[in-house]
Amino acid sequence: MKNKGYPLRSSMDELSTKNDNEIDLEKGPLPEYNSEDGSTLPPYSEIWKYIKTVSEDSSTGPTETTNPNVERRQEFKDSHPNIYSLLRLLISVLAVIVVFFTAWVCVNPLEKSIFGKVAFFVTIGITCPILLITIFCFFETWTQAVAQCIKVTVIFLAQCVKVTAVFLAKCIKVTAVFLAKCVKVTAVFLAKCIKVTAVFLAKCVKVTAVFLAKCVKVIAVGLYNSKKDLVVTIWLAWVVICFILFGCVKDGRLNLNKALICSTCSISAALFFILLLVCIPIWTLKHMLFGLFQVLGVQSCVVIVTKGLMYLFDKHIDATGYEIEASSLFVIGNFLFFYEMERPGALKRMPKFIGNGIASFLGGLGNAFGGIGNAFGGIGNAIGRIGNAFRGANDNNDIPLGEMDVESEV
């Protein structure tokens, strides 16, 4: 094939020429290379070949950088082989001792069992020699690995500290700006909130005062008109206070005799205060106080009679007896108070009522015995009638047969 006067070019030359034309559009085409005078630079293809040749030559040479520590260790190993071997053995033994004591601490709690002894002997007999041989034979490898790990760790920590310091500085700056804006916005917001809250509280105080005045008026009227509900409420309050007092007695913090006497007095004072607050009419307060004093008198009489009987018969009430007495007085007192408040004057009429009850009971017993006597008289009459019946039957048996036939015909 004829080249028609065109010089032969390689594919690399064409690619470099194409790239040169694409890159140097503003500067124009490069001058032709003249190998004779050498005044102009060679084309890019020859520069690329030269760079490639230099890189290939440099790649064939040694690329590993010599480490001073490795060189010093190699020189020490070559000059003092015995000391180096002894040092390797010492470090290996120290590592095995560390493993041995670690195994001893872990296995010591289980040493009394068979499993603990077997594990300990396996650790001593197999693991430690293998570990000693491995560390001694691969001393240089694992020391280099440890050194490399320490180096990488130190570099990583330094970078982490640097990044953290930069990050914290930026965070502090951003936080300071944010806090400044927050303080400004918060101050404005709090000023508005204080203003709105003051206006709202003023309105609330006004509305609350009016509402409480109406509530007090309604409650006073309602309590004045519903005396029965008030009596039930007072009675429930008395029950609660008595339970508290008897709980203190049960716990040992209060003497029972004092509790029996002081309970009514305390309740009277509390109810007096409550009734003064709700403005109950004076006759209701007077009635309640008389009822409480009457109940207190009944309780005191029961306590005195009980104590007198116990000392008269030379017997003392134990803890269980005190509880029974307290429960009885509690039930009697509440019943009498509630009955007095429901039916005014019931406690005053109680002696007469008790006398009438006793008289009625005795009259009932007399009537019962009279009825029993009448019953026995009726039984006697019935027996007499039965005797008369038997006597009449015997008289009929004495009549002759002829007379019986005549009577039958008639």
From Swiss-Prot:
GO BP field: meiotic drive
Region Disordered: start-end pairs: 1-39
Organism domain of life: Eukaryota
A Pfam family: WTF
Keywords of this entry: Cytoplasm, Endoplasmic reticulum, Membrane, Toxin, Transmembrane, Transmembrane helix, Vacuole
Gene Ontology cellular-component terms listed: ascus epiplasm; cytoplasm; endoplasmic reticulum membrane; vacuolar membrane
Start-end of Basic and acidic residues biased regions: 11-29
Transmembrane domains' residue ranges: 89-109, 119-139, 149-169, 174-194, 204-224, 229-249, 265-285, 289-309, 319-339, 353-373
Function noted in UniProt: Promotes unequal transmission of alleles from the parental zygote to progeny spores by acting as poison/antidote system where the poison and antidote proteins are produced from the same locus; the poison component is trans-acting and targets all spores within an ascus whereas the antidote component is spore-specific, leading to poisoning of all progeny that do not inherit the allele.
Subunit description: Homomer. Forms protein aggregates. The two isoforms can interact with each other and with themselves. High sequence similarity is required for their interaction.
Membership in a protein family: Belongs to the WTF family.
The protein's name in its UniProt record: Meiotic driver wtf18
Source organism of this protein record: Schizosaccharomyces pombe
Gene expressing this chain: wtf18
